[in-house]
A protein has these predicted regions:
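Non-Sec secretion/translocation targeting segments of pathogen effectors
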Residues: 133-143
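A broad, low-specificity signal marking well-ordered, structured residues that form hydrophobic/aromatic
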Residues: 49, 99, 141
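Acidic, aromatic-enriched beta-alpha/helix-loop junctions
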Residues: 34-82
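A generic structural signal for short, solvent-exposed coil/turn residues
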Residues: 1, 25-27, 43, 76-78, ...
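Short, cationic low-complexity segments
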Residues: 116-133
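Short, compact, well-ordered microdomains
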Residues: 67-121
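OB-fold ssDNA-binding interfaces and closely related basic DNA-contact patches used
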Residues: 1-40
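Structured catalytic/translocation cores of nucleotide/phosphate-coupled proteins
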Residues: 2-3, 86, 143
Length: 143
């Protein structure tokens, strides 16, 4: 079996080399992204990058809400590896606030080709037609 392509994840306990698993949530087919690492030669779940909030609005199939556990580190990870664009919208559930992100499906396909392809097929799109990150307007680029 081929070793998955990893990304560095920095957090308060150090640096982890993680790989992505792309899938969809069973209840509504929203985008799921999991963070995994190899433990004793086997893939082991490290954390969920996304959380399913079926009541919260999304702007497209490439959008998801970020799990609130270590969310600052997760948002930094997304920016660092250019996996998506952080949106201004948030959603609340219980006492938690979740940030919305528009993911670049082509970029996700670089790290989990099979999972991304299956997710896209489930939604009837091909990789060449994948939604990209929303382009930044001029004032955002100058920051």
């Amino acid at each position: 079996m081929e070793e998955p392509k990893t990304l560095s994840y920095d957090w308060q306990y150090g640096r982890e080399e993680l790989f992505l698993r792309v899938d969809s949530y069973m209840s509504d087919d929203n985008l799921y992204i999991g963070l995994y690492h190899m433990e004793d030669g086997y893939p082991e779940s490290f954390a969920d990058l996304t959380v399913n909030l079926p009541f919260a609005p999304l702007g497209g199939i490439n959008e998801a809400y970020i799990d609130h556990n270590f969310s600052k580190e997760k948002l930094r990870f997304i920016k660092q590896h250019k996996l998506g664009t952080i949106q201004p919208d948030t959603a609340s559930s219980g006492y938690c606030i979740f940030q919305r992100v528009a993911f670049d499906l082509k970029k996700l396909a670089e790290y989990d080709p099979q999972g991304t392809r299956e997710f896209m097929e489930c939604h009837g799109i091909q990789i060449k037609n994948a939604p990209k990150q929303k382009p930044k307007n001029k004032s955002q680029r100058e920051r």
